[in-house]
């Protein structure tokens, strides 16, 4: 699957003065850890299920991890970034049935909209953008291996009579399961049931065991599964197989929102451990905060969504939307309010007015300050404050660096993704 077109990202001068290490907070340990090794960096970020794209919660995730890609590249690392798109899954099929739109067309339309939004927000595209459908052969091979190793098993029909032969992972095969978070079994079961799991499925060896292969049902899409029979993949195994194929293990960062920490990342990590015999397939798990609106986390089920495309269509500069996001640390939960957009538009106008002054305080100091902020757990608010301070001083007539405006514009573009 083709990703969107990446923006042109300018190179900055004096790369030797750039921090050579970007540190992020690992969910598993709670500690800051270097991200990137031996001149290379690799990251997997979970992508959209394309049936309602792109709201500010999505944008928050992808803009946040875009900062990491930009910081890595500025530091001279060779970056491999992989993102999936879950282009077949129960929520997509349910939305298609409810609207009378073919599920393939719905997915294609929403993926195209997502791409337009990523282009508008100047998010750097991943090197590999992989759909669940195209990963089916890899999933089949992985599930067959797990069955052969007794790390998976088949179950009989569900209570509705369907699903005879569904394949589930035996989490008992992974002694490290649960090591990513700090949840007890009751908390895991509650979240598993809320987030797509089926703890009460008859025939399972344990309530938390996740689906690997859903055998063919009437009026559902399916694909050849070799010895598994026709069907479609489970959610967690899709990401595990895509990461294994396009990144290998271990890779540096597994990224996504905090709502993916459990069960999705915990279970994908478990599958990778079983398939690769690697204790820590991802060196660090990095999770972004949730965005709320009208008092609740933005969610498709609640319908309290603010769409990037609608903001842009109303005349909002996409760079102001990006600045709304950059005003918050990626790990922060925050609530969107209309006033935030006005503040972001004012900030954008101030930065542009500062560039028009012709000279100002040292641009090199801005580059160093923004780099230092991003190297410290992607501190976007700290980086934005550096630019705010420079802009205020430039407008006040301080400084005589004639090249400052051009230097700052390149830095803000390259590191923060904001085109001035």
Curated annotation (Swiss-Prot):
GO terms for molecular function: ATP binding; cysteine-glucosaminylinositol ligase activity; cysteine-tRNA ligase activity; zinc ion binding. Catalyzes the ATP-dependent condensation of GlcN-Ins and L-cysteine to form L-Cys-GlcN-Ins. The gene is mshC. InterPro entries: Cys-tRNA/MSH_ligase, Mycothiol_ligase_MshC, Rossmann-like_a/b/a_fold, tRNA-synt_1_cat_dom. HAMAP family: MshC. One of its GO terms (cellular component) is cytosol. This is L-cysteine:1D-myo-inositol 2-amino-2-deoxy-alpha-D-glucopyranoside ligase. Gene3D superfamilies: Anticodon-binding domain of a subclass of class I aminoacyl-tRNA synthetases, HUPs. L-cysteinyl-5'-AMP binds at residues 46-49, 61, 84-86, 235, 257-259, 291. It catalyses: 1D-myo-inositol 2-amino-2-deoxy-alpha-D-glucopyranoside + L-cysteine + ATP = 1D-myo-inositol 2-(L-cysteinylamino)-2-deoxy-alpha-D-glucopyranoside + AMP + diphosphate + H(+). A motif ('HIGH' region) lies at residues 48-58.
């Amino acid at each position: 699957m083709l990703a969107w077109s990446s923006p042109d990202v300018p190179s900055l001068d004096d790369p030797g003065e750039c921090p050579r290490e970007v540190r992020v907070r690992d969910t598993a340990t709670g500690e800051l850890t270097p991200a990137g090794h031996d001149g290379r960096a690799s990251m997997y970020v979970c992508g959209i299920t394309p049936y309602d794209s792109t709201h500010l919660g999505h944008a928050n995730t992808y803009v946040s991890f875009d900062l990491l890609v930009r910081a890595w590249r500025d530091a001279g690392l060779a970056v491999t970034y992989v993102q999936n798109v879950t282009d077949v899954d129960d929520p997509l099929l349910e939305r298609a049935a409810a609207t009378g739109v073919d599920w393939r067309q719905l997915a294609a339309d929403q993926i195209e909209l997502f791409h337009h939004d990523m282009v508008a927000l100047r998010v750097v595209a991943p090197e590999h953008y992989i759909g669940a459908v195209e990963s089916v052969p890899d999933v089949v091979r992985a599930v067959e291996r797990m069955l052969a190793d007794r790390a998976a098993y088949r179950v009989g029909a569900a209570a509705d009579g369907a699903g005879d032969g569904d394949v589930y992972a035996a989490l008992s095969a992974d002694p490290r399961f649960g090591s990513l978070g700090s949840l007890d079994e009751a908390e895991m079961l509650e979240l598993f049931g809320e987030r797509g799991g089926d703890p009460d499925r008859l025939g399972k060896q344990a309530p938390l065991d996740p689906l690997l292969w859903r055998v063919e049902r009437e009026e559902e899409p399916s694909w050849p599964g070799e010895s598994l029979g026709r069907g479609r993949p489970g959610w967690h195994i899709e990401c595990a197989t895509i990461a294994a194929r396009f990144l290998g293990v271990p890779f540096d960062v597994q990224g996504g929102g905090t709502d993916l920490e459990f069960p999705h990342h915990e279970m994908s990590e478990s599958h990778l451990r079983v398939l690769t015999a690697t204790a820590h397939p991802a060196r660090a798990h990095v999770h972004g905060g949730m965005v709320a609106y009208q008092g609740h986390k933005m969610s498709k089920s609640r319908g309290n969504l603010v769409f990037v495309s609608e903001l842009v269509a109303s005349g909002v500069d996409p760079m102001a939307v990006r600045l709304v996001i950059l005003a918050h640390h990626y790990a922060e939960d925050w609530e969107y309010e209309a006033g935030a957009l006005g503040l972001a538009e004012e900030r954008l106008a101030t930065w542009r007015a500062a560039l028009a002054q012709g000279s100002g305080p040292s641009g090199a100091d801005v580059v160093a300050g923004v780099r230092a902020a991003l190297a410290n757990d992607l501190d976007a608010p700290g980086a934005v404050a550096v630019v705010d301070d420079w802009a205020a001083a430039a407008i006040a007539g301080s400084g005589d660096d004639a090249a400052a405006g051009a230097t700052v514009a390149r830095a803000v573009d390259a590191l923060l993704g904001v085109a001035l």
